[in-house]
Amino acid sequence: MHPTTFDLIAVGGGTAGLVTAAGGAGLGAKVALVERHRMGGECLWNGCVPSKALLAVAKTAKMVRHARAFGIETGNARVHLNEALAHVKRVQARIAPHDSPERFRGLGVHVAQGQAVFVDRHTLEVNGERLTARNIVIATGTSPAVPPIPGLAETGFHTNETIFDIAELPTTLLVVGGGPIGTELAQAFARLGSTVHIIEALPVFFAREDAEIAALLREQLEAEGIRFHLGAQAMRARREGSSTVLVVRAADGQETELTGDALLIATGRRPNMDGLGLEHVRVVTDRGGVVADARLRTNIPGIYAAGDIVSGGLKFTHVADVMARAVLRNALFPGSSAVDYSAVPWVTYTDPELARVGLTEHEARERHGSSIGVWRREIGAVDRVIADGGPPGLVKIVTDRRGRVLGGHILSAHAGDMIGELTIAMKFGLTVGQLSGVIHPYPTTAEAIKQAAEQRVKSTFAGWM
């Protein structure tokens, strides 16, 4: 076996690995990419793309059912799940060529498909072939973490890796885990016609989000028929005929049985480290993944980590992209630079969407005391939302005493598109006074940001006249 030598090897064909490989090749480096399964990663095959496609189907189903409010008679809306899932597959098929081995080989990347195993800190073995590089990037991502619930394996269950291949629409869907993945899929199936229960161990819904915004979203999900069991533990599962019975223990210790046609486990993620041979090179890991510093360097010179595999990192596709670009700078150029995580937005793609950047109101009060400002605008009062018949929501901006943006929170249709404005404000230290002076086109939902910012200006001049 004769080694093939590269400047850079990316292990993993998800976002971090793909950006590293394409970027490195574009800079003129000799690059290899190793992927043991399908290129495109979790986002394309089991996450962002299929879930958003299914949510689009579900939103359309809801719109059809409520079309009479707009003077449109549609009759009974029937969901054909096989056709809905075929739409999901078509969306994936349109995007997949961008991440394909053929495209990357065309970019000049050596693509090796198989399990990568570290031989030493500069060498990997893949299907009997040895690849050597000055720098290696671990970007193997994560997989669903399945809790040790007695009877679960025998009962059968879905994760985000299998739910998009479900054969029939469940009459009742039980979702264990009330985070973004579980909640998005819960709403999708509820709108498609399933009765949905969410079983969440934490006593508060979306505990990491702003409490006011999360409470508003929960109200809307409950109004759509989703049933929440908060502070509840899934104790054991069993099969009764074609149904799954889940025994759930509430916070007060009382146990109840929930029966469903399908069970979805959405309780978090675990790092994909098995089989890499990290012990051969003594890369430090923990339960969260590969330990790396702000410059994405592991404890072993020349070995980096990027994307969801990084322990303690924010597990978002856009963060994986930023990490990969930082690795390229640090691995291929003199000097080094850290990733700036001070203004990272994220979105939960329910309807309405929940978008967030920076500190919550509670976090801001803990750090800055009572001098903070909180400026709100109800989405339902915005002209465009009224015209669209959109759902209620809220724009909430948290500022320091000078009016600089510390955090922004939006519950609205298109919140994911709107949060960029508040992210820029945070990134560059803008004040809400400056935001209030930005001309926004009328009528748009984004006017709510300007109107929220104007609340501080009004409060400043209140009583002057």
Language-model segments: which ranges?
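Beta1/beta-strand and adjacent pyrophosphate-binding region of the FAD-binding site
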Residues: 2-16, 169-179
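Glycine-rich flavin
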Residues: 3-6, 22-29, 34-169, 202-206, ...
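Flexible, glycine-rich terminal cap/loop adjacent to redox cofactors
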Residues: 9-13, 19, 25-37, 49, ...
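Short hydrophobic core segments
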Residues: 9-11, 116, 131-141, 175-176, ...
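FAD-binding beta-loop-beta segment adjacent to the flavin cofactor pocket
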Residues: 144, 288-302, 383-396, 400
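Glycine-rich dinucleotide-binding loop and its adjacent helix/turn
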Residues: 48, 140-195, 199, 227-228, ...
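FAD-site-proximal beta/loop scaffold in flavoenzymes
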Residues: 153-170, 257-333
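A Rossmann-like FAD-binding core segment of flavoenzymes
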Residues: 74-75, 110-113, 117-125, 193-294, ...
